Amino acid sequence: MRSDVVMKKMFLAIFTLLIIVLNTGCGKKSEIISADLAKIMNDNFTFSEKLTEIDSTSAEERYSLSKKDYNEICAFVGTKGTCDEFVIIKTDDTEAVIKNLNKYLEVKYEVYSAYRPNEIDKLKNPIIEEYKNTVVMIISNNNEDALRLYKEYLKK
């Protein structure tokens, strides 16, 4: 009889612990919702100018991607007068996407070195973050605050 009581208490303790762990998790999102993050970036962060969303075909060309490289893409860019932009890419191959983004940044750096040298500082430390199956790139005049906002989004 005592063993039944002990077993019930152990089961209850384990069940309670499991519920606590499942409810608290690690305090991070299970995945990035592109539209939500884009809204947060546009509403709560000040870029050098208002960014415009581009369609997936334009984003593919811009970042040298093909449809097989990503599952979803959401990109906002400025005019050619500024480097500011951000892109959210859901993919099965984050490594390949990051490689393409780095190539894109190298070319952009070369172009802006001659064209708009005052924009170069933004390109020296761009944000490229990988979270699960998503890659996020942000180029702005205040990458520290942009990164902080992105990380706050992940915690919610």
Task: Name what the model sees in each region.
Residues 119-156:
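A short, solvent-exposed beta-edge/loop patch
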Residues 27-29:
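Bacterial signal peptide processing site
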Residues 1-10:
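Positively charged n-region of N-terminal signal peptides that target proteins for export
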Residues 9-17:
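Sec-dependent N-terminal signal peptides
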Residues 83-94:
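A short acidic-to-branched-hydrophobic micro-motif
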Residues 22-25:
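C-terminal motif of bacterial Sec signal peptides marking the signal peptidase cleavage site
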Residues 94-132:
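Short Gly/Thr-rich strand-loop-strand
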